[in-house]
Design a protein with these regions (language model features):
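Alpha-helical DNA-recognition elements
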Residues: 24, 60, 119
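A short alpha-helical element within helix-turn-helix/winged-helix DNA-binding domains
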Residues: 36-47
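Conserved segment of winged-helix/HTH DNA-binding domains
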Residues: 81-106
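Beta-hairpin "wing" of winged helix-turn-helix
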Residues: 30-35, 62-72, 76-79
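Short, cationic-aromatic polyanion-contact patches
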Residues: 15, 39, 73-90
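N-terminal intrinsically disordered/low-complexity leader segments
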Residues: 1-10, 126-134
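Key DNA-contact positions within bacterial/archaeal DNA-binding proteins
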Residues: 52
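C-terminal regulatory/oligomerization modules of transcriptional regulators
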Residues: 104-134
């Protein structure tokens, strides 16, 4: 069963962290249409958070068309990711795993890896903007 994790130091509200994790799990194929999400009660107890936080996340997922509640049964994934995405992501994941091994060998911790990716992504976006303008 799918399990959530929270990062208290991320600065991202807990309900958004839950929403982002479901989106990512769906894109990566860890969750599929019809899969049941953990109950509000279970998530709240597991993460030691207010159940209303979980309800807010699940409502956001419902609003986005990603999940839907079934009375008396729970909340289920209702959306599917693009069929081509998992295949495309397999190649990207293989490249990423190779890169992460190199980062690990270089002694980078999770925070340094995240920062490096964020900076590289930002620089690439700026570069792409410049190319579009020219």
């Amino acid at each position: 069963m799918f399990r959530f994790r929270l990062d208290g130091s991320s600065g991202v509200p807990p309900y958004l962290q839950l929403v982002h994790q479901v989106r990512q799990a769906l894109l990566l194929g860890y969750l599929r249409e019809g899969d049941r999400l953990p109950t509000v009660k279970d998530v709240a107890a597991d993460l030691v958070i207010n159940p209303n936080t979980v309800v807010k996340a699940y409502r956001q997922l419902e609003h986005e068309g990603i999940a839907g509640g079934r009375p008396g049964q729970g909340t289920f994934i209702t959306a599917t990711s693009s069929p081509a995405l998992p295949e495309a992501q397999q190649a990207l994941r293989a490249s990423l795993e190779e890169w992460l091994r190199a980062a690990d060998e270089a002694g980078l911790d999770d925070e340094a890896v995240t920062a490096l990716i964020a900076v590289a992504r930002q620089e690439l976006r700026q570069e792409l903007k410049k190319e579009r303008v020219q």
